[in-house]
Amino acid sequence: MARDKIALIGSGQIGGTLAHLIGLKELGDVVMFDIAEGVPQGKALDIAQSSPVDGFDAHYSGANSYEALDNAKVCIVTAGVPRKPGMSRDDLLSINLKVMEQVGAGIKKYAPDAFVICITNPLDAMVWALQKASGLPAKKVVGMAGVLDSARFRYFLADEFNVSVEDVTAFVLGGHGDTMVPLTKYSTVAGIPLPDLVKMGWTSQARIDEIVDRTRNGGAEIVNLLKTGSAYYAPAASAIAMAESYLRDKKRVLPCAAHLNGEFGVKDMYVGVPVVIGSKGVERIVEIELAGKDREAFDKSVAAVQGLVDACKKIAPDLLGR
């Protein structure tokens, strides 16, 4: 049986990490695309030469033309300018919006049946623009945000309680930014909700609040430490979890930036919510109940995303007609 074709649009740090993980998990053949001549070709060759050592079979190629995306089953988009110290995700908007228009046109022409995962920041606005530019069904275009944010939350909680990350579940909703909403009542250790663990004396509410705040600023913390770029190992691993659920019809429940059209009271926007990802793309949006402070925080996050989307509409009004 022929292997699935996975196109990586953008061959920087995340793109290279994605390519290697795809091989290690034997998810399919890889084509790496980038506008920088030689970069996708060189990285593809380098990773391909690791296959005899790592023990996987896959075909790798690099390209500078969108034609290489032809018939890709999955497209993962990392193209754009990375976030740098002192730069907010909002600062990236106008530059990366133009990139999404170009990428969307390429996907529309050569891979109209693909499942598309966007990683480019500011994420919630960029995945909205990418879906508009590509014209693909909304259920086939998602943004990688919640899996990463939840993974950071899980790691910090596991470290706090000195338990395995495998026994920690966490939910982070809303936009991928400072207004994200880590939900403590839906986050557990071996099935025990965080509020109960506070009552049991395992930790304090003040400490949980500190972890929530660190989760919200998880990306910025790494940017400030690296000084030359942003995170790439965890973002790549998060996108691979989404791609694998689609390719293997695993139907995992994952928090992603998904298109909402009435769910959670939101219309025509991409916001981080739990979804089921299977062979049809986003097969179900899990509309959990939000009340009190959680609802207020979610609405605030949605408003922040709306602000970015409105800015996109002003910069590229023609997107609305697609």
From Swiss-Prot:
InterPro entries: L-lactate/malate_DH, Lactate/malate_DH_C, Lactate/malate_DH_N, Lactate_DH/Glyco_Ohase_4_C, Malate_DH_type3, NAD(P)-bd_dom_sf. Catalyzes the reversible oxidation of malate to oxaloacetate. GO terms for biological process: lactate metabolic process; tricarboxylic acid cycle. The gene is mdh. It is an enzyme of class 1 (oxidoreductase). NCBIfam families: MalateDH_bact, PRK06223.1. This is Malate dehydrogenase. It comes from Bradyrhizobium sp. (strain BTAi1 / ATCC BAA-1182). GO terms for molecular function: L-lactate dehydrogenase activity; L-malate dehydrogenase (NAD+) activity. Transmembrane segments: none annotated. Substrate binds at R83, R89, N121, R152. Keywords: NAD, Oxidoreductase, Tricarboxylic acid cycle. Belongs to the LDH/MDH superfamily. MDH type 3 family.
